[in-house]
Amino acid sequence: MAQAGRTGYDNREIVMKYIHYKLSQRGYEWDAGDADAAPLGAAPTPGIFSFQPESNPMPAVHRDMAARTSPLRPLVATAGPALSPVPPVVHLTLRRAGDDFSRRYRRDFAEMSSQLHLTPFTARGRFATVVEELFRDGVNWGRIVAFFEFGGVMCVESVNREMSPLVDNIALWMTEYLNRHLHTWIQDNGGWDAFVELYGPSMRPLFDFSWLSLKTLLSLALVGACITLGAYLGHK
């Protein structure tokens, strides 16, 4: 596989294609085409997601509120070094790892979805609370996969609740967090190429916490309890 160099791959492309995949698993279509419809590295354009079946669009005031009511700062697109195109094997390996994660905890994820209580006013706060707990004790590949899968759950739940414009925001928040908080760790640990080598066809186990209920951990995180979810989410 071609090495991406120090700058790495485009996190936005990875996020967009992962979300597209998770939504397609539930029968939601993305009519805007490929994730590269907007320039690489740019913030997602409002309204680029379109779903079937069609639902009533969220009022503009709610879309704005979803972006403003959050402890996370908005992502500002800045010029930087050119990022390498993401090899298909990276997307494929991440999808397989996410599917493995969701299969192991299918019932827990289903129950967690019902507990999210997503609204345009609470979505970003929910995202921030869970992600901060997830990485409280540091970063590893298992936690990164859990991060992607949680983002996918939020996107699916948003569409299920007829709040599909939230998907644009969730994609932005995921990209923002990857760029600001996870990118350096990923590059220092061999980049996404290392992830593929470690967890590709052989699928080295990422998740070794079957004795602990994911539902319990994520439910506690959702209400802001000070637990360390990340400590149980795999190993480097």
Curated annotation (Swiss-Prot):
GO cellular component terms? BAD-BCL-2 complex; cytoplasm; cytosol; endoplasmic reticulum; endoplasmic reticulum membrane; membrane; mitochondrial membrane; mitochondrial outer membrane
Record membrane topology: Single-pass membrane protein
Origin, by domain of life?
Eukaryota
Gene inactivation effect: In response to intraperitoneal injection of muramyl dipeptide (MDP), knockout animals show lower serum IL1B levels than wild type. Mutant macrophages release 30% less IL1B than the wild-type cells.
According to its UniProt record, where is this protein mainly located?
mitochondrion
UniProt cross-references to CDD domains, sorted A to Z: Bcl-2_like
Give TM segment ranges: 209-230
Q: How is it modified after translation?
A: Phosphorylation/dephosphorylation on Ser-70 regulates anti-apoptotic activity. Growth factor-stimulated phosphorylation on Ser-70 by PKC is required for the anti-apoptosis activity and occurs during the G2/M phase of the cell cycle. In the absence of growth factors, BCL2 appears to be phosphorylated by other protein kinases such as ERKs and stress-activated kinases. Phosphorylated by MAPK8/JNK1 at Thr-69, Ser-70 and Ser-84, which stimulates starvation-induced autophagy. Dephosphorylated by protein phosphatase 2A (PP2A). Proteolytically cleaved by caspases during apoptosis. The cleaved protein, lacking the BH4 motif, has pro-apoptotic activity, causes the release of cytochrome c into the cytosol promoting further caspase activity.
Keywords for the protein's UniProt record, in alphabetical order:
Apoptosis, Autophagy, Cytoplasm, Endoplasmic reticulum, Membrane, Mitochondrion, Mitochondrion outer membrane, Nucleus, Phosphoprotein, Transmembrane, Transmembrane helix, Ubl conjugation
The short motif BH1 is annotated over: 133-152
Motif BH3 extends across: 90-104
Protein's name in the database: Apoptosis regulator Bcl-2
